[in-house]
Amino acid sequence: MSDRLFIFDTTLRDGEQVPGCQLNTVEKIQVAKALETLGVDIIEAGFPVSSPGDFESVVEISKAVTWPTICALTRAVENDIKVAAEALRYAKHKRIHTGIGTSDYHIKYKFNSTREEIVERAVAAVKYAKKFVEDVQFYAEDAGRTDNEYLARVVEAVIKAGATVINIPDTTGYCLPDEFGQKILYLKEHVSGIDNVTIATHCHNDLGMATANTMAGIQNG
């Protein structure tokens, strides 16, 4: 287990997906300042390409807070990444969070693609993001349902491409704590270069296991 834990707060991005919880820019700035006061390390401020409002919020939050890293979400799409970089232009500490689905369900039914093509798209996205910022976080969407051997292959490839943070999401709230902890441990034991990056978790609460899975990830990472 690492001696240093970082708190990554996604209230202003993923939290807004809760029905009825949309915030305007002024309200988002108030939340961001409160998170800074609490000592949150990274604030995921939004998904800039998704709407003009999200773009504006990331810009204004970047101006309003001082020491937390401001993170912007993207898909593994060049225009997403370019727009995110523009939204982060005023951030003192900036991070682009890019990624792609890695489970066979996503590969086949969402992307109509192959495992090989997904690796290529993941690597290309990280390399493109590195043109704008040094701190690049990669998410393997639906990692909870991705077999560990293939997940390790993707993670190793994006680390070689320059990713500084690896996010392992349980997107569908599928995993039990033992299973999720073992997934993190597998990556620690099988991915070259994993000790040179930060491992992040993003656990959904469909089965009420988000906190337990997060703690299992910490114990094994």
Say what each PLM segment does.
Residues 5-7, 17-43, 55-64, 78-199, ...:
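Alpha/beta enzyme core
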Residues 40-48, 71:
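Divalent metal-dependent hydrolysis catalytic cores, especially in the metallo-beta-lactamase
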Residues 1-2:
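Basic/polar N-terminal segments that are highly enriched at the extreme N-terminus
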Residues 48-53, 75-78:
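Short active-site-proximal "capping" loops at secondary-structure junctions
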Residues 203-209:
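Active-site-adjacent loop and "lid" segments of alpha/beta metabolic enzymes
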Residues 10:
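Flexible glycine/acidic-rich beta-alpha junction loops that bind and position SAM and/or redox cofactors
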Residues 67-74:
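A glycine-rich helix N-cap at a beta->alpha junction
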Residues 13:
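Short, ordered coil/turn segments that flank beta-strands lining enzyme active or ligand-binding pockets
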